[in-house]
Amino acid sequence: MNGRADFREPNAQVSRPIPDIGGGYIPTEEEWRLFAECHEECFWFRSVPLAATSMLITQGLISKGILSSHPKYGSIPKLLFACIVGYFAGKLSYVKTCQEKFKKLENSPLGEALRSGELRRSSPPGHYTQKPKFDSNVSGQSSFGTSPAADNIEKEALPRYEPIPFSASMNESTPTGITDHIAQGPEPNLEESPKRKGVTYEELRSKNRESYGVTLPHKTDPSVRPMQERVPKKEVKVNKYGDTWDE
């Protein structure tokens, strides 16, 4: 042990580092030879045939009147354009074949880069990602034995976990730490409820009459008026001095 704990999972697949191929990369002799071979084959087997075919097709379309020729230069501009298009189309079509040749080339950084890129595209995500190394290098050099100070730091950093009793997990009404319960009011006293008397409709009606009679002025029933009000008064005569007499 050298004071550093380095844990790795067994059978972990670690990808080989991809060679750095930038703008200043200098190809090897084998790569230069393969470049020249690809250029020659691309020119004779792809660019020339496609350029000639494009020019023949363009000339046939001009002869049939489908394409119009230039009034001064005739069909030369369109034939040149068809030749250029066919030439570059042939070069693009040979790129895949040239890449396959470089992949088969041994001891070639360029071929290794092409193979690694193809494997990364074809493999599922995370297949070639390196497994994290568990280095206990947080507080300087560490070994399998940890100090009490490091244990205290780890305990403070980690969140505290309070286990819930088994009986609480079986009870659905026990709160689980989430404040989603609904506050309930105080339960009614069950002992006082039987003591209350039931109020009938007649009692309520009589109480309403009493309260209504207090708020209104007292009115007497015409049938209970005194008898003297019902008896018509006798007509009396009054003299000029205010004296009255009956006839």
UniProtKB/Swiss-Prot annotation:
* Keyword Phosphoprotein in record: yes
Out of the domains of life, which is the source? Eukaryota
Oligomeric state and partners?
A: Interacts with OCIAD2. Interacts with STAT3.
Domain text: The OCIA domain is necessary and sufficient for endosomal localization.
Q: Which Pfam families match?
A: OCIA
Reproduce the miscellaneous comment text.
'Asrij' stands for 'blood' in Sanskrit as this protein is strongly expressed in blood vessels.
Protein name (database record)? OCIA domain-containing protein 1
The entry's function note states:
Maintains stem cell potency. Increases STAT3 phosphorylation and controls ERK phosphorylation. May act as a scaffold, increasing STAT3 recruitment onto endosomes.
Q: Where is this region: Disordered?
A: 113-153, 167-230
Q: Give residues where Phosphoserine occurs.
A: 108, 116, 123, 193
Q: Where is the composition biased (Polar residues)?
A: 136-146, 168-177
Q: Which GO terms describe its biological process?
A: regulation of stem cell differentiation
Similarity annotation: Belongs to the OCIAD1 family.
Q: Which residues form the OCIA domain?
A: 1-112
User: What tissues express this gene product?
Assistant: Expressed at high levels in the brain and at lower levels in the heart, ovary, testis and kidney. Expression is strongest in embryonic stem cells and in the blood vessels.
Q: Where does the UniProt annotation locate this protein? A: Endosome
